[in-house]
Amino acid sequence: MVVAFDIDGTLARAPFLPNNVRQMAPRPEIIRLLRTLSKAGIQIMVVTARPEAYRLDTEWWLRRHAIPYRILRMRRSGDNRPDPALRAEQVAGATVLFDDKPDNCAQAGVRCVRV
């Protein structure tokens, strides 16, 4: 089983702020749930509409907050689709998505838990 988690607004408290990627506050309650699922053997996929240019900062933030994951899917350079269309592609292979945006949940094509 693969469970997907959005970053901004889900694992992190705030929406994406390009100048504040490394300082974003985590949501400990969601991160605890993610860790519990990971320890139970569930594969974790992290998805974000952040541009690929922020991969190193994003990976740093995930390590800083000890967030285990197997896959990190980000927005490819030049991809200007609306977030819900992107999210539907990103969560391919996942069974469940945790996300803060209703539109992402509605179009994801998988069971979604809004947080």
Regions found by a protein language model. Give the residues of each.
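Conserved Rossmann-like nucleotide-cofactor binding loop
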Residues: 10, 52, 103
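Short phosphate-binding/catalytic loops that engage adenosine nucleotides
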Residues: 42, 67, 110
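Substrate-recognition "cap/lid" segment bordering the active-site pocket of phosphatases
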Residues: 52-95
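Acidic, Mg2+-coordinating phosphoryl-transfer loop and its flanking beta/alpha structural elements
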Residues: 91-115
